């Protein structure tokens, strides 16, 4: 998948990310912009999770939505 495809894919899934993690702000979503490590970091920040817990949540979300970064 090239960068343009990944960006388009992110736009499609952005709403689903907000549904899953409602504490993420629009500014957070702009920072994340399809970057998995940024999503994990923002989940840690907003929810007070340890990195491994945030990683597990993202892993689970990826599997449910068949999302590839």
From Swiss-Prot:
Organism domain of life: Bacteria
Pfam families: CsbD (PF05532)
NCBIfam families linked: PRK10428.1
Similarity field: Belongs to the UPF0337 (CsbD) family.
Protein name in UniProt: UPF0337 protein YjbJ
Protein's organism: Escherichia coli O6:H1 (strain CFT073 / ATCC 700928 / UPEC)
